[in-house]
Amino acid sequence: MQKQKIRIRLKAFDYKLIDQSAQEIVETAKRTGAIVKGPVPLPTRMQRFDILRSPHVNKTSRDQFEMRTHQRLMDIVDPTDKTVDALMKLDLPAGVDVEIKLQ
């Protein structure tokens, strides 16, 4: 019989928030008897933007902004029904994007 696996991918702009959410997921899964692999930190995606300061002249004067997207990956191997219910009821902060895939 093939084992089922849940792959969870977290994305957030704040690394403290994403680490806290990952820790909550790991504790919940372990408490319900599932095996957790991770969280694995994926490469941080950085987007840089150069904006002209002046609306008319002075093209050499620019502001630079950057946006960092932190990512974590976790696998929950052979989850029970109790694990899935606990993960669905878990309340995570609004700044964390969660993608869940069943494999």
From Swiss-Prot:
Question: Quick one: which gene encodes this?
Answer: rpsJ
**GO cellular component assignments:** ribonucleoprotein complex; ribosome
The record's annotation in Pfam families points to: Ribosomal_S10
Q: Which SMART domains does the record match to this protein? A: Ribosomal_S10 (SM01403)
How would you summarize the oligomeric state and partners of this protein?
A: Part of the 30S ribosomal subunit.
- Function of the protein: Involved in the binding of tRNA to the ribosomes.
* UniProt keyword terms in alphabetical order: Ribonucleoprotein, Ribosomal protein
Indicate yes or no for the key word Ribonucleoprotein: yes
Question: Do the record's keywords include Metal-binding?
Answer: no
- This protein's name: Small ribosomal subunit protein uS10
Q: Which family does it belong to?
A: Belongs to the universal ribosomal protein uS10 family.
Against InterPro entries, the record matches this protein to:
Ribosomal_uS10, Ribosomal_uS10_CS, Ribosomal_uS10_dom, Ribosomal_uS10_dom_sf
Indicate the segments annotated as coiled coil, or none if absent: none
Any one of the GO BP annotations: translation
This chain's source organism reads Leptothrix cholodnii (strain ATCC 51168 / LMG 8142 / SP-6) (Leptothrix discophora (strain SP-6))
**What GO MF terms are annotated?**
structural constituent of ribosome; tRNA binding
